Amino acid sequence: MVIRVKTKDDFPLDPDAPRLQTALRYAATGSEHRNDMQIFPSSFSTPLGGDPFPEEGIRFTCMVELAQSAGELRLNSNDPHEQMFINCRYLEHPRDRERLREGVRIILDMMEHEPFNGIVEELILPMEAHLASDETLDRWLLENVWIGQHLSGTCKMGSDSDEMAVVDQYGRVRGVQGLRV
């Protein structure tokens, strides 16, 4: 989730500085996992080709790690050229929405601290109306959520008796003859 901020005109944005320089890892309130959330600021002093946020300034990205929502990926046919069915189901689990709401509010609280007084001109997104209640913030989150990492993943390896195993100990994909990973 991206929180967009307009910086003050006199705040120097260094076009040679890395866009990403630091990250905050923390455990969401009530989490049983350590570091299940991540927040990082990014500087946008120069345009990036295809970047959806053209204004100069900064943004804060809040990421839910160890999401409880689970998406779905399946083949529509055995034709390798046909697009597969993908449903990410972002924020489908209430706990993921709760954690992301908390992350957005942590960012907004950080921006109220004195070190940001000389940096932040105004909040661009979310707007005040989005912050009016959990319901309006959830609606905004669901409309604007996106994946924040490069797509990659792992599939469980295990015995035939393990329903969650996708491949056997030799990397053979279950249910697809002749396919190994």
Protein language model features and the residues they cover:
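FAD-dependent oxidoreductase catalytic-site/capping-region signature
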Residues: 12-181
